[in-house]
Amino acid sequence: MPSTALGEFVGTLVLILLGNGVVAGVLLEKSKANGAGWMVITAGWGFAVLCGVLVAVALGAPGELNPAVMLANVIAGTRTVPDALVHVVAQMAGAIAGATLVWLHYFSHWRETRDQGAILACFSNAPAIRGTVPNLISEIIATMVLVLVGTAIGTTGVAGGRRSSFEALL
C-alpha cells in the first residue's frame, strides 16, 4: 500500500501542477499564455489528467487521483475503507504540493495581476450563475461522468479487453 499511496501522491501532484498551471498561465498578467482562452485551459486540464494517471500507474498506483473515485471504489467493494483513507490523504497531500508549486512558479505574476477573481480562479472554480441546487446538480453530473468514464476505461472487455486504465490509454 505505501508504494500505491506514493503513486497517488505524485500523480495528483502532476495533475494539479499541470492543470492549475495552465489556468495560471492563461489568467495571470504578463505570463506568456495570458489571454489564451478557455479552450487552452480545457485542453491543458485534459492533458494534466492523462499525465497524472500515467505517472501514478507507472508508480504502481491505481491512478484514481480523486477522492470521489476512491469513494466509488469503496462503494463498489473494490477498496477497503482503511486503504481508501490512506490514498485520499496521499491525494490531498499531492494536490497541496502541486498547488504550492504552481504558486511558487508564478510567484512574480501574483503581484502583477490586479483581478482578484483571476487569482482565485487559479486554485478554485466558481459558477457563472450562482444557485445552490443547480450548482450542486452540475457537480454531481460532472463527478458521475468522471467516475463512469474512469471505471469504463479500466473494465475488462473495454478498450480491447485491457485490464488497467494505463493499458487502455496506450
For the regions a language model picked out, list residue spans one by one.
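Membrane-interface helix-loop junctions and terminal tails of multi-pass membrane proteins
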Residues: 1-170
